Curated annotation (Swiss-Prot):
HAMAP family named in the record: Asp_carb_tr (MF_00001)
Protein's name in the database: Aspartate carbamoyltransferase catalytic subunit
Lineage: Bacteria, Pseudomonadati, Pseudomonadota, Betaproteobacteria, Burkholderiales
Enzyme Commission identifier(s): 2.1.3.2
Residues where carbamoyl phosphate binds: 91-92, 141, 171, 174, 300-301
GO cellular component: cytosol
Keyword Transferase: yes
Superkingdom of origin: Bacteria
MF annotations from Gene Ontology: amino acid binding; aspartate carbamoyltransferase activity
Length: 343
């Protein structure tokens, strides 16, 4: 577990090597072609600012598709998108499916529980068989960190892979839609204070957000949470660590709340949900400590009365539902960009 013996506000947290912030599965950057184009989206870490801006700019063009009578563009007509969700999801899978269909792709949702993997077939055998069916794009969610990397390394050359969340490692499209939301409301990343609050240790969203925020030039990123829920390595990326919510929220422009990921916890890291809310829940009173025009975000699913008060979640500074709307456009942008590249 992470510990910090200094007791100072803003002091870095220490952690065992297994809990360090950075992951590394393959050498180099397997996401890019030899021409520097995006072939796969596996993680935000290591991507240049130009590619992040390309995705955000492309997403901006797709936002208006939602308001059309016919909500389709022909960009991926004739392409086959396979949603491979080895881990349960409703929101992410649905938005990927909507995004692919709005790009005119054919979408196949694989029922993992009834698939060959539950009959003993290996992950790579499954991927090879699906590649032989002339799949063009795999959208992969998996409980094991690094699974999308393995698939990208071994799938057929014509197949593109998008990571829809792997273990505690990364959730790049969530990170990108968070960046789109921030840019939509705040415009200039270089003048912001952004706070990420809660279970950062187990959060792949937090990792993706921090990599994106630092790449896009945010001058102050704060990680706020109990000592047991903060990973080591944050300070090496320039992140300020706070163990007091009131102090950490002071004057911030963006607040990203995270749920407790009890399914990824081993052992008793926290007291009850009620006690957690008393110390770490975002209430109207605590929100008042932030900048007057601060926005409140949450990747979902929300646990009201645990990490966030309903008055805040439903209040005028909340942009949580807009994140969901923007997520479709961002995933359209990612699929359109990767499926249009050639190695």
């Amino acid at each position: 577990m992470t510990t910090d013996t200094s007791g100072r506000t803003g002091a870095p947290a220490a952690a065992a090597p297994a809990e360090r912030f950075r992951y590394g599965f393959l050498k180099g950057n397997p996401q890019l072609t030899k021409n520097g184009e995006l072939k796969h989206l596996l993680t935000i870490e290591g991507l240049p600012r130009a590619i992040l801006n390309q995705i955000l700019d492309t997403a901006e063009q797709f936002v208006s598709v939602t308001d059309r009578e016919v909500k389709k563009v022909p960009l991926l007509r004739g392409k086959s998108v396979f949603n491979l969700f080895f881990e349960n999801s409703t929101r992410t899978r649905t938005t990927f499916e909507i995004a692919a269909k709005r790009l005119s792709a054919d979408v196949i949702n694989l029922n993992i529980n009834a698939s060959s993997t539950s009959k003993g077939e290996s992950l790579l055998d499954t991927i090879n068989n699906l590649s032989a069916m002339h799949a063009d794009l795999f959208v992969v969610r998996h409980a094991s960190s690094g699974a999308p990397y393995l698939i990208a390394e071994h799938c057929a050359p014509h197949v593109h892979v998008i990571n829809a969340g792997d273990g505690r490692h990364a959730h790049p499209t969530q990170g990108l839609l968070d960046m789109y939301t921030i840019r939509h409301y705040k415009r200039d990343f270089t003048k912001l204070r952004v706070a990420i609050v809660g279970d950062i240790l187990h959060s792949r969203v937090a990792r993706s957000d921090i990599h994106a925020l630092t790449t896009l030039g945010v001058p102050e990123v704060r990680a706020i949470g109990p000592r047991t829920l903060l990973p080591g390595g944050l300070e090496q990326m320039g992140v300020r660590v706070f163990h007091n919510l009131d102090e950490g929220l002071k004057d911030v422009d963006v607040i990203i709340m995270l749920r407790l990921q009890n399914e990824r916890m081993s052992g008793a890291l926290l007291p009850s949900a009620q006690e957690y809310f008393k110390s770490w829940g975002l209430t109207p009173e605590r929100l008042a400590l932030a900048a007057p025009d601060a926005i409140v975000m949450h990747p979902g699913p929300m646990n009201r009365g645990v990490e966030i008060d309903s008055q805040v979640a439903d209040g005028p500074q909340s942009v949580i539902l807009n994140q969901v709307t923007f997520g479709i456009a961002v995933r359209m942008a990612v699929m359109g960009i990767v499926a249009g590249t050639n190695d």
